[in-house]
Amino acid sequence: MEFQKIHFQKAHFLISAPDIRHLDKHLPPESGIEIAFAGRSNAGKSSALNRLTRQKGLARTSKTPGRTQLINVFEIEEGKRLIDLPGYGFAKVPLAMKLKWQKSLGEYLQERESLKGLVVLMDIRQPFKELDQQLIYWAIDADIPVLALLTKADKLKQGARKTTLLKMREEAKNFEGDVQVELFSSLKGIGLEMLEQKVTSWYAQGETPSTALDEISI
């Protein structure tokens, strides 16, 4: 199926918010279409967003895990947004902050009406950790489709990559939801075209019939 081309390189920073309540004030929850990116600290989330948008500095990368503490919103075009959710799972972050982040993530995934797809990024060498699974279950409960990316795929040889991918696809069946598992490497571009196609399809599916008709009639 052909979808309207998305110009990811036009993405620009819109706002940051500490939680869903602040986000709702600036962007009504029913407005537009949002695709969220989430992952453990240093899973390669910021690098993936930068590669997708062809912008090295759009999402700030850091050698210090746990640096992303806010919900960061980027707009590609009016009504189409990418959401950079706080990184999670870093051991040196205080417990109170961990719990706050997890609460913020859960509320966003379960309550944000404009969310139409979730990309979960996991280091291919440490996939489907407990918090990754919790995130995916939250999304499934909210009827949100999930793309699970095994990042840093270039760190493994091709045979090991394929073996891990097949194993993780089998594990993903246990979620009993719409969970697709793929390889990804920001460095080598592995899986980039697939990511573009998936996000584009989510934007298309998230459009209301009236919006789609308006675009056709223009």
UniProtKB/Swiss-Prot annotation:
Top-rank lineage group of the source organism: Bacteria
Domain EngB-type G: 31-205
Protein name: Probable GTP-binding protein EngB
Similarity annotation: Belongs to the TRAFAC class TrmE-Era-EngA-EngB-Septin-like GTPase superfamily. EngB GTPase family.
PROSITE patterns in UniProt: G_ENGB (PS51706)
BP-aspect Gene Ontology terms: division septum assembly
UniProt keyword list: Cell cycle, Cell division, GTP-binding, Magnesium, Metal-binding, Nucleotide-binding, Septation
Purpose: Necessary for normal cell division and for the maintenance of normal septation.
Matching PANTHER family: ENGB-TYPE G DOMAIN-CONTAINING PROTEIN, MSS1/TRME-RELATED GTP-BINDING PROTEIN
Binding-site positions, Mg(2+): S46, T68
Gene3D superfamilies on file: P-loop containing nucleotide triphosphate hydrolases
